[in-house]
């Protein structure tokens, strides 16, 4: 990157930073007035809407007074006439004689109307006499009809897009770039007016500007003479002022006239001119009565700011030559009379030449130039932060796109530019096209075509179509001669919708664009355009693009915290409603729609910072599982108590590999893989469920662990199983899951017990194991209840059915979690437990083929250590699930890796390599810590550290954070040695070894 480019890049950044500061600090120097000129009232309305939008979104300094002035009475009065109209507006506004329209933001607008009052110069008030004193005024002439780029006729070229994201995340426009680039100029002048042309973007450093004197100052930039021959050039006199104006001279002529410096460069006219207060007062003297105003501001004179106001300021100018200067309109007597007065008022002033270098300007000229700028020419402006793709879902580099959704199944040709449009599946756009403001749904657009949609004031639509190289001033369309200039040819059909208008225009193209009786031209469609519809369409499309981009990221399961950045921290009610409406329509029993639904809600929780959307996400997961789980639930009125009493005792489980992969929604989207083992403690199965007959018509539930027992005679009490603080929630869920009582249906307890043949007593306990052990006791206890009830009823139950009943119980209880715990205790031995990706999980259990010798070695080297602390309740499940749903890369990677390690663990055990298994256990421990930093704490770390030299492998049980720890001892190390070490360090604090044995 050259030094010049680096300078401009940093200057651009400095201006952007300064502008952000001005937005938040009104005490910094800023423009007192920003005035835009417009060609007619319709265009003025469009400009006002644009400025109101920016004020509403805090994109403009509120302290500045903004005015949009159309040419008076709708007449084309030229840029000079428009400038005089600005001066009169400011003078009358200062005097309080203007009757402004007030917009909701409280900002006052000029309406451009000529007020028939007594001449202001008659008895001017004090404020009017000094209207320009101390005022910094920015005027942007933007009243053209944009014939050379018709797609911007309605919105105005001034508000045409610039391919840069503003600091607030919105797409920039030429106007926004003006405000940023010129914000520093206000501080470089004490008072006066800066006049700019609305179709040229200047890139410069405001620190190179100083203007505190009388007269005017022209801002120029250095360019090679070869470029200067196509532009206006200033010739500098000996005093450093503008000596003359040279317009589109050859390189030889520029040399002959002394305009070329020793480096072969000329001073390019940028269209930006600064004027002092004295000069403004002199200009105002030309229109200080109604009669004078009418004489100077009219269609006959059609004064040009550049030809009529600046020429007299050049030191080498003459009145005779001034009369011959090419006018903006025609040579008329009215123009000659005005020039005589202007010469007398201005010729005594000088115009300083301010040379800015390094500097550059970008001219938004013709459609072809625009297309080049937005595609192939983009590279030369990337240092300014310009991008070929702005607010679009498309990442294709062969074409440019701004504020557009382009289907992945649409085909866009190289070198094309798509803006403010929606391209559906099957759409084909040829090479080098400009597509603007339309919806294409499967149509084909030929190469080198402009297609631009407009809403008209009667709520109908027109789509204008012409060649990229067509000149609307000429009588040709797509290279074919037509009867009148394209600008006025009524060849475009009008339809009720934009889609119908697209189809009708494409048919007209195929028919050779015949003149239509009810057709409309470029000119008339511009004049009849509903300018108030432009911003809402762009906003609506911007929302649509962001929504579709988010949905694409959701469907790819990308990181949602990155994906939501497309909204730049802002989300409006319309987007929220659309996303919620979309989510509500999705079927959570269909896997793709389920995945999309939960992530839409999660994205909304990120965007709105509201927990209710995260709750909806988690509720959707629970509901999806619950619907599948309770699908087979039914009350069995034929069930009978076949035995007096049934007691079921089960082992606990230890988790080795893959834990968390069994947790919804991960297992639903990817399947789960878990390696675990059933374990006895002190030779006993500690999980117990007892079912027995009791006399009477009651159902009695008991929890030996909590010492609670209660008789129930109301069915509604038994059906309420979702209260996590209810000591009998598990018992109630077991009765529902096994068909003892109905899930929802109302029936009396008396009828239930009558059908059973007696009352029922269900008791549970976990013998001598502390709560929060991490050994899966809650799920295994649920399995014990199901086994006991089915055995009491004399029913056969397969392992798969058993797993499903327990899953059903856990969903009824709303406990969430995965399926590995119950399988760990219900199926004997060491096994690999798996499931495929599906909403309804089908669990497969495959016993590991482990030799007797390996199992014996494991029993000798494996032991459990109680940490002496109960695992604290945490929102762990919510946290892990949220991070997975969000697409957190680290979480997703860990969940994949722990499954891979589970498979490798099985391999090592089946090969008899306990040392290899121990190393994998250590790797899993590190992954568990990555997934959840709360799985360990100072106490757990200290326990592991204290026995580090005695063990080869370590791991937590369950989610960790307390409860039991598991270790693989080094060969030759005994359990007693570990116990002794723990006693030495922790004494009798409860940290100790528990004897255990793997169930074969």
Task: Report residues per predicted region.
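Intrinsically disordered, low-complexity terminal tails and inter-domain linkers enriched
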Residues: 95-131
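Short helix/loop capping segments that flank catalytic or ligand/cofactor-binding pockets
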Residues: 45-46, 148-150, 204-206, 227-229, ...
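Left-handed beta-helix
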Residues: 1-42, 68-69, 82, 87, ...
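N-terminal glycine-rich phosphate-binding loop and ensuing alpha1 helix
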Residues: 2-96, 128-196, 201-211
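DPxDG-like acidic metal-binding loop motif
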Residues: 155, 159-160, 773-795
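Stable alpha-helical structural segments in soluble proteins, enriched in small hydrophobic residues
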Residues: 86, 178, 617, 621-625, ...
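Conserved core of the sugar-phosphate nucleotidyltransferase
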Residues: 134, 153-154, 160-196, 200-297, ...
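C-terminal nucleotide
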Residues: 519-754, 795, 804-816, 822-956, ...
């Amino acid at each position: 990157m050259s030094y010049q480019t680096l300078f401009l890049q940093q200057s651009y950044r400095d201006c952007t930073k300064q502008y952000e500061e001005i937005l938040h600090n009104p005490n910094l120097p800023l423009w007192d007035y920003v005035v835009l000129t417009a060609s007619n009232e319709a265009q003025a309305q469009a400009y006002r809407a644009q400025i109101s939008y920016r004020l509403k979104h805090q994109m403009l300094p509120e302290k500045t007074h903004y005015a949009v002035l159309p040419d008076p009475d709708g007449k084309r009065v030229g840029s000079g006439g428009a400038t005089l109209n600005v001066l009169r507006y400011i003078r009358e506004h200062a005097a309080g004689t203007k009757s402004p329209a007030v917009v909701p933001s409280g900002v006052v607008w000029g309406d451009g109307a000529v007020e028939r009052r007594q001449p202001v110069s008659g008895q001017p008030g004090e404020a009017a006499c000094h209207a320009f004193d101390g005022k910094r005024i920015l005027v942007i002439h933007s009243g053209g009809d944009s014939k050379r780029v018709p797609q911007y006729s309605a919105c105005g070229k001034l508000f045409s897009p610039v391919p840069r994201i503003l600091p607030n995340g919105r797409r920039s426009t030429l106007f926004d770039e003006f405000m940023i680039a010129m914000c520093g100029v206000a501080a470089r002048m004490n008072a006066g007016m800066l006049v700019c042309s609305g179709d040229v973007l200047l890139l410069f450093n405001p620190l190179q500007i100083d203007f505190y004197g009388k007269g005017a100052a022209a801002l120029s930039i250095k360019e090679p003479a070869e470029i200067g021959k196509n532009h206006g050039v200033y010739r500098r006199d000996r005093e450093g002022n503008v000596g003359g104006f040279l317009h589109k001279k050859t390189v030889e002529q520029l040399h002959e006239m002394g305009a070329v410096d020793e480096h072969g460069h000329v001073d390019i006219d940028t269209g930006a001119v600064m004027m002092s207060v004295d000069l403004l007062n002199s200009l105002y003297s030309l229109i200080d009565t109604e009669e004078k105003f009418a004489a100077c501001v009219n269609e006959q004179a059609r004064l040009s700011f550049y030809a009529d106001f600046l020429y007299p300021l050049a030191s080498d100018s003459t009145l005779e030559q001034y009369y011959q200067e090419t006018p903006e309109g025609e040579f008329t007597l009215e123009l000659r009379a005005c020039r005589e007065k202007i010469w007398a008022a201005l010729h005594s002033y000088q115009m300083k030449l301010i040379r800015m270098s390094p500097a550059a300007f970008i001219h938004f000229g013709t459609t072809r130039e625009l297309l080049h700028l937005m595609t192939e020419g983009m590279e030369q402006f990337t240092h300014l932060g310009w991008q070929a793709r702005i607010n679009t879902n498309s990442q294709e580099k062969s074409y440019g796109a701004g504020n557009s959704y382009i289907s992945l199944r649409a085909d866009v040709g190289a070198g094309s530019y798509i803006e403010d449009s929606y391209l559906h599946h099957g759409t084909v756009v040829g090479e080098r096209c400009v597509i603007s403001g339309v919806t294409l749904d499967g149509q084909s657009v030929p190469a080198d075509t402009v297609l631009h949609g407009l809403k008209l004031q009667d709520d109908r639509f027109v789509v204008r179509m012409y060649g990229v190289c067509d000149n609307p001033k000429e009588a040709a369309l797509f290279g074919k001669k037509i009867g009148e200039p394209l600008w006025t040819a009524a060849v475009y059909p009008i339809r009720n919708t934009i889609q119908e208008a697209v189809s009708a225009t494409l048919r007209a193209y195929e028919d050779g664009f015949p003149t239509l009786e009810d057709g409309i031209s470029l000119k008339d469609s511009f004049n009849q355009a509903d300018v108030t519809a432009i911003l809402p369409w762009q906003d609506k499309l911007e929302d649509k693009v962001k929504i579709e981009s988010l949905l694409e990221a959701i469907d790819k399961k990308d990181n949602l915290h990155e994906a939501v950045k497309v909204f730049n921290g802002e989300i409006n009610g319309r987007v929220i409603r659309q996303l919620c409406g979309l989510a509500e329509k999705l079927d959570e029993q269909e896997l793709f729609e389920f995945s999309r639904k939960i992530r839409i809600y999660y994205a909304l929780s990120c965007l709105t910072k509201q927990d209710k959307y995260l709750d909806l996400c988690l509720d959707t997961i629970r509901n999806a599982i619950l619907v599948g789980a309770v699908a087979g639930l039914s009350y069995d009125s034929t069930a009978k108590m076949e035995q007096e009493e049934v007691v079921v005792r089960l082992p606990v489980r230890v988790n080795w590999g893959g834990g968390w992969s069994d947790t919804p929604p991960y297992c639903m989207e990817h399947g789960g893989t878990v390696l675990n083992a059933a374990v006895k403690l002190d030779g006993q199965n500690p999980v117990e469920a007892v079912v027995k007959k009791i006399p009477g018509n009651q159902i009695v539930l008991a929890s030996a662990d909590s010492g609670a027992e209660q008789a129930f005679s109301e069915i509604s009490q038994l059906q309420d199983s979702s209260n996590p603080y209810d000591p009998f929630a598990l018992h109630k869920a077991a009765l529902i899951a096994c068909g003892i009582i109905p899930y929802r249906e109302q029936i009396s307890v008396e009828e239930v017990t009558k059908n059973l043949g007696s009352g029922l007593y269900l008791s549970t306990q976990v013998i001598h194991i502390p709560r929060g052990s991490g050994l899966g006791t809650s799920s295994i206890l649920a399995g014990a209840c199901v086994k006991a009830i089915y055995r009491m009823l004399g029913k056969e139950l397969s392992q798969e059915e058993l797993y499903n009943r327990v899953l059903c119980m856990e969903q009824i209880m709303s406990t969430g979690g995965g399926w590995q715990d119950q399988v760990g205790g219900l199926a004997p031995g060491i096994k690999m437990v798996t499931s495929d990706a599906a909403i309804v999980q089908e669990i497969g259990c495959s016993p590991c083929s482990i030799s007797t010798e390996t199992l014996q070695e494991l029993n000798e080297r494996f032991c459990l250590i109680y940490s002496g602390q109960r695992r604290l309740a945490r929102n762990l499940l919510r946290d892990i699930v949220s991070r997975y749903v969000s697409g957190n890369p680290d979480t997703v990677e860990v969940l994949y890796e722990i499954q891979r390690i589970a498979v490798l663990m099985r391999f090592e055990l089946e090969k008899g390599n306990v040392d290899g298994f121990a190393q994998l256990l250590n790797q899993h421990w590190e992954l568990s810590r990555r997934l959840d930093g709360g799985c360990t704490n100072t106490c757990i770390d200290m326990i592991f550290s204290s026995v580090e030299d005695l063990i080869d492998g370590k791991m937590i049980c369950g989610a960790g954070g307390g409860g039991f720890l598991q270790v693989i001892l080094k060969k030759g190390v005994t359990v007693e040695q570990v116990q002794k070490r723990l006693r030495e360090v922790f004494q009798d604090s409860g940290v100790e070894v528990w004897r255990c044995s793997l169930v074969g």
